[in-house]
Amino acid sequence: MEPEIKIVNVVVSTQIGTDIDLEYAADILDNAEYEPEQFPGLVCRLSEPKVALLIFRSGKLNCTGAKCKEDAVIAIHKIIKELKEAGMDLIDNPEVNVQNMVATTELGMEPNLDDISTLECTEYEPEQFPGLVYRLSDPKVVVLIFGSGKVVITGLKVIEDAYKAYDKISKTLKELEEELY
């Protein structure tokens, strides 16, 4: 049965221009904060789509919190439009690259994390963090497995890798169970 995998965060980056006047941009944009003594970038939070955008003087822009790449692109275009209308010289349609996606799913069972921690590429220190960290090399992602059966997959570039990772973990857990019991 195909697992229900839900994307919960997409982080993208792009270049919207060069030498951005962040003080001016902060004055123009609603919900923008610019405190250079705290953080070198301007932080702008949108409610629709619900994302946070980080804009740097270099023109680099990161968008986080989107549920899909399309939402991030919409948010970036909204910001570019607002800044251009205020006279800023920016790139109209910048190339947007996915840096990371985070997905969640369920195993459908409560795994024995102590047993799984015997596998290579796993870390489990319940005193420090309740989840088991499982680093896969293909696809190159990090899978967090919790005792409740909840799974978080991070480091994704494409959704297909979430399914590959889930299949690989499921297969490995079945093999481990057969070996141990």
Curated annotation (Swiss-Prot):
User: Keyword Lipid biosynthesis: yes or no?
Assistant: no
Q: Which InterPro entries match?
A: TBP (IPR000814), TBP_archaea (IPR033711), TBP_CS (IPR030491), TBP_dom_sf (IPR012295)
The answer to whether UniProt assigns keyword rRNA-binding to this entry is no
Looking up NCBIfam families in the UniProt record yields: PRK00394.1-2, PRK00394.1-3
Q: Which HAMAP family match?
A: TATA_bind_prot_arch
Instruction: Give one Pfam family, short name only.
Output: TBP
Its taxonomic placement starts with: Archaea, Methanobacteriati, Methanobacteriota, Methanomada group, Methanococci
Keywords noted in UniProt: DNA-binding, Repeat, Transcription, Transcription regulation
What Gene Ontology biological process does one annotation of this record name?
DNA-templated transcription initiation
Record-given protein name: TATA-box-binding protein
User: One GO molecular-function annotation for this sequence?
Assistant: DNA binding
**sequence repeats: from-to residues:** 7-83, 98-173
Report the family membership.
Answer: Belongs to the TBP family.
What domain of life does the native source organism fall in? Answer: Archaea
Q: What does this protein do?
A: General factor that plays a role in the activation of archaeal genes transcribed by RNA polymerase. Binds specifically to the TATA box promoter element which lies close to the position of transcription initiation.
**What species does this protein belong to?**
Methanococcus maripaludis (strain C6 / ATCC BAA-1332)
